Amino acid sequence: MLDANKLQQAVDQAYTQFHSLNGGQNADYIPFLANVPGQLAAVAIVTSDGNVYSAGDSDYRFALESISKVCTLALALEDVGPQAVQDKIGADPTGLPFNSVIALELHGGKPLSPLVNAGAIATTSLINAENAEQRWQRILHIQQQLAGELVALSDEVNQSEQTTNFHNRAIAWLLYSAGYLYCDAMEACDVYTRQCSTLINTVELATLGATLAAGGVNPLTHKRVLQADNVPYILAEMMMEGLYGRSGDWAYRVGLPGKSGVGGGILAVVPGVMGIAAFSPPLDEEGNSVRGQKMVASVAKQLGYNVFKG
C-alpha cells in the first residue's frame, strides 16, 4: 500500500517549492493561450487504485493541446494495431521541433512519430470513421474515457486555433502528397485541431496517466478503456518523444514516460503505480511547462520513481 500522507506531502512540497518559479512565457502564437494567467500552477497524483492527491489550482481547466496526441495514439492502436501504427506513422524520435517538416522531407514523407504534429495529424487520419464528425466524436470519447467525462471541446480555444493553424494545414497537405494521410487532408487537420482544443484539469490529466499506469483501466470509473497489450507502445512513445526536444533530458533526469502540451500541462506515468500531472502556462523554448517539469520531477524524486532503477 502507498502511504497517503507521503503522497500528499510530495505533492505539497513540489507545489510549494516551484509554483512561483520564474522563467518561461505563455505560448503566444495561439491567442487563447497567450491570455491564460501566468501565475496559475497545480500538481496532482492519481494512483492506479484510484486515490487522488493535489495541490494548487488543480480545478482550473486548461487546453489539452499536444497531450491529446497520447489519446489519439491510444485509439489508433485499438483500431488498427501496433504494427500498422509503426508501418504507417513510425516509432522514432525526430530530434526536431514538434511542428517541423524537415523529418518529412528526409524520410520520404513518413512522419516517424505520432507525438509530433506531422505524426499526430496522420494518426488522426487512421481512426476508423465514416466522416469527420464521427472521427471527432470517437477521439473526444477516448479522451473522456481516459481522463474524465467532463473533458469537452472549448469553442473559444478551437476558434483561436483554427484561425492560426496554417502551418499544420501545410503539414497535412505534405503528408497527403506523400501518401501518408488516410483521409482528406483538411478533415484530418480540422479534427486534429479540435482534439487539441479540449479543456482538462490537473486531476483529470493525472487520471489519464493513472489509466495508463493501470494497464488501460481507469481507476476512478473501474472501466477498461484500452487493451493492456497496447499500453507499452504508448509509454514507449512518451519516453522517446513526449517532451519534444527535452525528451532525452527528461528520460535522463526523471526516467518516466511523459507528455507535455503548450497549454501548460505535463503528464508522467509510473507504470503499475500512478499518474503524476502538473500545470502552469509559462513554457520553455521547446514548449514544455517550466514549473510543471519541476513539479512532476520533484514528486517522482521524492517518491523514488524512475523506470530505469532496479
Curated annotation (Swiss-Prot):
Residues modified as N6-acetyllysine: 294
GO molecular function, one term: glutaminase activity
Keywords: Acetylation, Hydrolase
Substrates-to-products reaction catalysed: L-glutamine + H2O = L-glutamate + NH4(+)
Binding-site positions, substrate: 66, 117, 161, 168, 192, 244, 262
Matching InterPro entries: Beta-lactam/transpept-like, Glutaminase
Keyword Oxidoreductase found: no
EC number: 3.5.1.2
A biological process term (GO) from this entry: glutamate biosynthetic process
Record note on quaternary structure: Homotetramer.
Protein family according to the UniProt entry: Belongs to the glutaminase family.
Protein name: Glutaminase 1
Taxonomic source organism: Escherichia coli O157:H7
Gene symbol of the encoding locus: glsA1
